[in-house]
Curated annotation (Swiss-Prot):
<keyword id="KW-0904">Protein phosphatase</keyword>
<keyword id="KW-0464">Manganese</keyword>
<dbReference type="GO" id="GO:0016791">
    <property type="term" value="F:phosphatase activity"/>
</dbReference>
<comment type="function">
    <text>PP2C-like phosphatase that can dephosphorylate YegI. In vitro, can hydrolyze p-nitrophenyl phosphate (pNPP) to p-nitrophenol.</text>
</comment>
<keyword id="KW-0378">Hydrolase</keyword>
<dbReference type="InterPro" id="IPR036457">
    <property type="entry name" value="PPM-type-like_dom_sf"/>
</dbReference>
<keyword id="KW-0597">Phosphoprotein</keyword>
<protein>
    <recommendedName>
        <fullName>Serine/threonine-protein phosphatase 3</fullName>
        <ecNumber>3.1.3.16</ecNumber>
    </recommendedName>
</protein>
<dbReference type="Pfam" id="PF13672">
    <property type="entry name" value="PP2C_2"/>
</dbReference>
<dbReference type="GO" id="GO:0004722">
    <property type="term" value="F:protein serine/threonine phosphatase activity"/>
</dbReference>
């Protein structure tokens, strides 16, 4: 019994034509709790395209989130609840404010969305500021517990650097381990979700989870590159010109 993971980020065609790098970031990790049970952590961020350091902000956000989780696991204090989510967001904001001050920039120059999922045998926590989504199967099929956040105007959303970020933070908690996890930035939101009701578009996810379930160890090593090729494919780029990130995890019995 173990987690099977794969994730990839690819630059959008609009960023390529503007000679911009990918401004998405992702981190996934398995940590081992004191009872030798595995803890899955997944963090995804999308740097705002309208600011100068959005990609840097996204990378700092996911790295700081993972460092925060490592510290919590080492300390043996791990309640998967709103308090953990809020403290993580505050820690990320502190890091972004420090970086902005060091570079003599405004913190809004590091604006990014932030999504996270943490899952142990005892519970699952999802957190979100901004658009993108975390789809999860908790034993009753795929669901999207938190709706992607839209801003006041079209193509706008909320960012972890916003003054009201902590109050905007949305969380979802459930008892028990997640069976399947898919976290993604808004670049593939229209492929991954039925936009009319913000429900998971199951046919989009099924091949990925089937592939994770059937893969040999050698094939698992190849999956990140295959996922990257898919995200950069003409079929995907016809639907979106944005950066794209997809992180997948499957609990294999």
């Amino acid at each position: 019994m173990s987690w099977r993971l794969v994730y990839a980020s690819t630059v959008g065609t609009s960023h390529i034509s503007a000679d911009l790098p990918c401004q998405d970031a992702c981190q996934m990790q398995i940590a081992w709790l004191n009872d030798q049970q595995p803890l899955l952590s997944v963090f995804v961020a999308d740097g705002a395209g309208s600011v100068s350091q959005g990609g840097e902000g996204a990378m700092l956000a996911v790295n700081e989130a993972m460092a925060y989780m490592s510290q919590k696991v080492q300390g043996g204090e791990l309640g998967l609840n709103d308090v953990l989510a809020t403290n993580m967001v505050l820690t990320i904001r502190q890091r972004l404010f420090a970086e902005a001050e060091a570079k003599e920039l405004a913190v809004r120059d590091f604006a990014c969305t932030f999504l996270g999922l943490i899952s142990s045998p005892d519970g699952t926590l999802i957190m979100q500021i901004g658009d993108g989504g975390v789809v999860v199967d908790l034993g009753h099929g795929l669901q999207l517990p938190l709706t992607p956040m839209a801003g006041e105007y079209a193509n706008m959303t909320h960012f972890i650097t916003d003054e009201d970020a902590v109050s905007r933070l949305e969380t979802f908690t459930s008892t028990g381990r997640a069976h399947k996890v898919a976290a993604f930035t808004d670049g593939i939101q229209r492929l991954a979700l039925n936009m009319l009701d913000n429900s998971p578009h199951v046919p989009f996810f099924t091949p990925f989870f089937n592939g994770l379930a059937a893969a040999t160890q050698e094939q698992l090593d190849l999956l990140p590159e295959l996922l990257k090729q898919f995200l950069s494919s003409p079929a995907v780029n016809e639907r979106t010109d944005d950066d794209k990130t997809l992180a997948l995890a499957l609990w294999a019995e």
